[in-house]
Amino acid sequence: MTKKAEELKMHEKDTGSSEVQIALLTGKIETLSAHIKQFKKDKHSSVGLLRAVNRRKKLLEYLKKNKFDSYKNVLTQLNLRK
């Protein structure tokens, strides 16, 4: 698990909360973005990147709607802009 996800855990064994999922997706998005910059013709990875971005977007919308305090915390911790 990434360092960012470790900071957002609710408890020791937390792997499925929205906050942790967003942190893990953010790491995956950063990795895929770097890969696609190097290999521009890799269409399968670009599809995977779009899926990860859309999944993170849905999770952020859920947090904004249901747990606004946590939403603000996630945005500041992960340096995301909204």
Curated annotation (Swiss-Prot):
Example of a GO MF term: structural constituent of ribosome
Q: Name one Pfam family in it.
A: Ribosomal_S15
The processes (GO biological process) annotated in the record are: translation
**InterPro entries on file:** Ribosomal_uS15 (IPR000589), Ribosomal_uS15_bac-type (IPR005290), uS15_NS1_RNA-bd_sf (IPR009068)
Per the record's keyword annotation, is RNA-binding included, yes or no? yes
Q: Does the keyword Hydrolase apply?
A: no
Kindly state the subunit structure of this protein.
Answer: Part of the 30S ribosomal subunit. Forms a bridge to the 50S subunit in the 70S ribosome, contacting the 23S rRNA.
- What is this protein's function? One of the primary rRNA binding proteins, it binds directly to 16S rRNA where it helps nucleate assembly of the platform of the 30S subunit by binding and bridging several RNA helices of the 16S rRNA. Forms an intersubunit bridge (bridge B4) with the 23S rRNA of the 50S subunit in the ribosome.
Q: What is the protein named?
A: Small ribosomal subunit protein uS15
Give the organism the record lists: Pelagibacter ubique (strain HTCC1062)
Give the gene that encodes this protein.
rpsO
